[in-house]
Amino acid sequence: VGTISDGSGCFNINSLVIFKDGNFIENPKSIAAYSKLLELMEVDNNLINESADQIIDWIDRDTLQRANGLEDYYYTGPLHNPREYSGMRLLISIDELKSIPAVRGINWNIYEDNFCALPIASNISININTLDQNDTYLLASIFPNIDLNDAAYIIDNIPKDGFDNFDNFSRTFPELDFESPNGNIDYKSKVFNTKIDIYHEDFQSSSQSIIMYENNKNGFIVARIYNGI
């Protein structure tokens, strides 16, 4: 049994960083979008700041602690079980966030329902044409001047054939302010999730893959997870 779905309809947690000069450094736009999404979810502001800094410290390759961050001294110390080193790489799965102390203070359903871990360190990018009413928080997080009601209105009025460019999109909602976005709006899917389940008598196995589709019409697998093989 196989399924394929748009892989961009989520907040890529790895977008909190960009890669520059051999290190992962903060991405201010994505941090702003992350903060707004959690604010809309009524998460305490201290937890928002702590979780953002601690996630970035987990990913980056240096040992310099951010204002609200944590580095290896904490993860290898007696207060952390099991003792481990920070990842120093992009996250493979959002489940890795469970190692982050500040994240454990936030309702896990928020991450499970809205976030993903794509192996991409760049601004958030979502396909507006594949969003549904479960994605209002995601859409509102990208635009500083769009609230949840605005986001729901936009999604409810996506035309059957979709939008094909930003001018077409923005002209449809002239009363809304799309200035200074903290992410990118796409009009075609470039990232896909595939899941394959195999059943044979008492045997069961599955695989999940992330496939990226480039402008040259070539696709390639950027991540794959197996279970039961």
Question: Residue locations for each model-derived region?
Answer:
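Compositionally biased linear targeting/interaction segments
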Residues: 1-229
